Amino acid sequence: MRGDIEQEKTLLIKRFRELAERYAGRIRDWEVTNETWWGWHNPRIAMNFYNQPDFVEWSFEQADRCFPSNRLIINEGPTKAWADFHGDRSCYYMQIERALLKGARIDSISMQYHMFFRAEKEQEITAMYYDPCRIYDVLDSYAMLGRNIQITELTIPAYAYTAEDEEIQAEIMRNIYSMWFSHPAM
């Protein structure tokens, strides 16, 4: 769909309207933007408009027009939401804050939680993701934006597909679900 920016906006508006006509009364929550750093400045992946500074704000403005009664969600992958976390100086936090300050109606903040790591590096890399203090730091920071938080697209692998691996996977899931849902912003 690469073209000039106005052409891309026209096609996006058309798509928003089509989705709203068909689903606005049936699907309550809409992810307006998803993984806005993925493919950043990669011409083979992203459309021209995707790289514009007002992409997020413009997208939420259009979504608000088409879905006035639905909940609008911003979503980001695990790297920007969790691994690159620096409190209110995190790029995802600042992106949301900027959009809100510019009047975007963002009803919910969503973060993905994929643990796609090789088995031999899994324990080392995921230590930060499974750390209760880190989880609460992330959730506390995003809660300061005054929106509820959702965790989406969750992946906790069972590497060997054995009963033991599945038990470990289940224990991790129980622990992180308990941490997430004990937070008041969830």
Where are these regions (language model features)?
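Aromatic-lined glycan-binding groove of carbohydrate-active enzymes
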Residues: 102-112, 138-155
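Structural recognition of alpha->loop->beta junctions
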Residues: 18-28, 95-108, 175-186
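Short loop/turn segments at strand-loop or loop-helix junctions that form parts
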Residues: 32-35, 76-77, 112-114, 152-155
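Active-site cleft segment of glycoside hydrolase catalytic domains centered on the general acid/base Glu
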Residues: 2-94, 119-137, 160-172
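Substrate-binding cleft of secreted/luminal carbohydrate-active enzymes
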Residues: 113-114, 150-154, 160, 167-186
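Structural preference for beta-strand elements that scaffold enzyme active sites
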Residues: 27-31, 69-73, 105-110, 148-151, ...
